[in-house]
Amino acid sequence: PNDQLDEEYSDGDIMIQACSNDPQVTFHAIHNLIRPFRDIIKIRWSQHGFISAKKNETPRNLMAFKDGTVNPRKNSDLKKYIFINNGWAKNGTYCIIRRIQIHIETWDRTALEEQEAIFGRKRSTGAPLTGKKEFDNIDLNAKNSKGEYVIDENAHTRLAREVKTSIKRRAYNYNDGTNAKTGNLDTGLLFICFQKSIQQFINIQNNLGHNDKLNEYITHRGSASFLVLPGIQKGGYIGETLFS
């Protein structure tokens, strides 16, 4: 719901993700990989992204809030929510990519207290409004002295948590300069997530898309989904379980 997708940032048959500490290395890795196949493939779209965070720290998005705090980390959770359990794609996963534009100028004019209410978390620490530290449990039933929910009924954190599932987020910020027509910054989030079923993402996004207060400040411009093949054993090859 509420998607405004641009065809130039959507779909595709094969996804390649290259990561490095140097964007020039990343560029040449992709360039050299696809160069031999120019006669048979065409790049549909691409997006450079970046993360600014120390090792083992939760990175922040361009809205200055931590992004990915509730990622599953235990092997049992990864097995339950992320990796496909059976069939030829066993130990593979599904990848969803969303190119989300952030209306940063509007966001910057929003008071900090309102920003934190929208996310349901403290900007400084990433802690839920019902806790003190980033990884404290979220109490969705907590109310203030006025009888109001501490975490707003339409807060991003609440709506995402209401859906009883989990996904593995791996999001990147992007900055593509300014829009020539509006003069506004073209910045946002290249949201990437992994799950054993695409329906997990659909259920979460449906809940967010209808009521999330954050929707006033973001627009989903691109969307794509891919199957990530299982890893390989010694002597094997990528896609072996599919082609053998």
Residue ranges, per PLM feature:
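Long, histidine/aromatic-enriched segments associated with O2/redox biology
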Residues: P1-S244
